[in-house]
């Protein structure tokens, strides 16, 4: 397992390109160095687009605020709608100054990217390319 450190700032990732080998397992250590809540999500572009309405729903229900996550509301809403728990193996949602981890095995040739699907962030380019070496 190789470790890659990712820093999230307000609307960009560092590094902006992640180079992996097919079949490689990566431990991503992600820190949110911005002033806003950000998401680190590994998926195809199509999957990100499909996930964005769920994220908008979290904003509408005041679970996802600009600079924090209302974890109590999140737990309550998750009882009615499991997508509100935001407990996906391919993603982590972080408040400012928080750190999270994801371990991911890259075993397909699917074109993946990392993106933040907090409403408005993907649209302004908060995306990092994943390239196979």
Regions found by a protein language model. Name each.
Residues 50-51, 90:
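Surface-exposed loop/edge segments in extracytoplasmic proteins
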Residues 52-56:
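Outer-membrane beta-barrel and related beta-rich outer-membrane complex signature
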Residues 10, 24, 30-34, 44:
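Generic secondary-structure microfeatures
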Residues 44-50, 132-133:
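Short edge-strand/loop segments of extracellular domains
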Residues 1-26, 83:
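N-terminal edge beta-strand
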Residues 39-43:
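Beta-strand signatures of extracellular beta-sandwich domains
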Residues 12, 31, 35-36, 66-71, ...:
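Extracellular/periplasmic metallocenter environments
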């Amino acid at each position: 397992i190789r470790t890659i450190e990712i820093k999230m700032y307000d609307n960009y990732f560092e590094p902006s390109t992640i180079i992996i080998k097919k079949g490689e397992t990566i431990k991503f250590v992600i820190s949110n160095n911005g002033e806003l809540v950000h998401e680190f999500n590994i998926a195809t572009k199509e999957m990100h687009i499909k996930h964005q309405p769920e994220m908008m729903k979290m904003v509408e229900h005041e679970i996802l605020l600009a600079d924090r996550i209302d974890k109590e509301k999140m737990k309550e809403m998750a009882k009615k709608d499991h997508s509100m728990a935001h407990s996906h193996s391919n993603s982590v949602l972080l408040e400012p100054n928080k750190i999270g981890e994801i371990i991911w095995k890259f075993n397909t040739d699917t074109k993946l990217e990392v993106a933040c699907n907090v409403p408005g962030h993907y649209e302004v380019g908060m995306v990092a390319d994943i390239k196979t070496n």
